[in-house]
């Protein structure tokens, strides 16, 4: 009976691990899709409204940083589980250090703060631009506001994923004697 309990427990652990890996790979795929969308974002032309132009420039800079973080995070993830991007086990891969992970976590935290600021700026800019009635300026304004909304939404989702992923990697490294 004792051996049977161990076998059942072990099988649940194996099934749980497989489920977590599958879910993580699915999340990584979604992250990759967001990453590609972020890379395709094009900063709109100047609108001559300083607050809106400043917002679009800041959104662009935040998008560049997010696009720089995503491949680094994916690399850390694959190194932490000892696999290549294709899912092939690789025993020669060097596990990431806790310092590497903490450095990336700091960058991700900074991104979180930037996105919170961008979100508050967006609401201010939206209120400010809603009073403009000049039909010649409206298309540029709408284009810039839509760009900011789309980008902030993508960046928000990606940053939440990045924060959770780095937290899990750090947790795995520090509790699993993987250092």
Give the ranges of each region predicted by the language model.
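Immediate post-signal-peptide N-terminus of mature secreted/exported proteins
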Residues: 23-92, 175-179
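Mature extracytoplasmic domains of secretory-pathway proteins
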Residues: 93-125
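A structural signal for well-ordered alpha-helices, especially hydrophobic packing surfaces
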Residues: 63-70, 74-77, 109-112, 116-119, ...
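Short E/K-rich amphipathic alpha-helical oligomerization segments
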Residues: 79-92, 120-142
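C-terminal amphipathic alpha-helix
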Residues: 45-48, 52-55, 59, 66, ...
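General helical structural elements
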Residues: 9-10, 38, 153
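Bacterial Sec-dependent N-terminal signal peptides
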Residues: 1-27
């Amino acid at each position: 009976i004792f051996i049977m309990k161990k076998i059942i427990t072990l099988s649940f652990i194996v099934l749980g691990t497989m489920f977590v890996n599958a879910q993580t790979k699915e999340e990584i795929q979604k992250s990759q899709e967001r990453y590609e969308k972020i890379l395709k974002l094009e900063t709109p032309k100047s609108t001559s409204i300083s607050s809106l132009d400043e917002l679009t420039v800041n959104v662009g800079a935040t998008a560049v940083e997010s696009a720089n973080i995503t491949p680094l995070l994916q690399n850390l993830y694959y190194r932490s589980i000892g696999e290549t991007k294709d899912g092939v086990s690789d025993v020669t891969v060097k596990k990431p250090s806790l310092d590497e992970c903490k450095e990336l976590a700091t960058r991700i935290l900074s991104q979180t703060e930037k996105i919170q600021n961008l979100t508050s700026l967006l609401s201010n800019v939206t209120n400010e631009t809603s009073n403009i009635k000049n039909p010649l300026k409206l298309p540029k304004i709408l284009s810039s506001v839509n760009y900011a909304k789309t980008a902030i939404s993508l960046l928000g989702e990606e940053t939440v994923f990045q924060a959770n992923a780095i937290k899990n990697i750090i947790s795995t490294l520090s509790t699993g004697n993987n250092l």
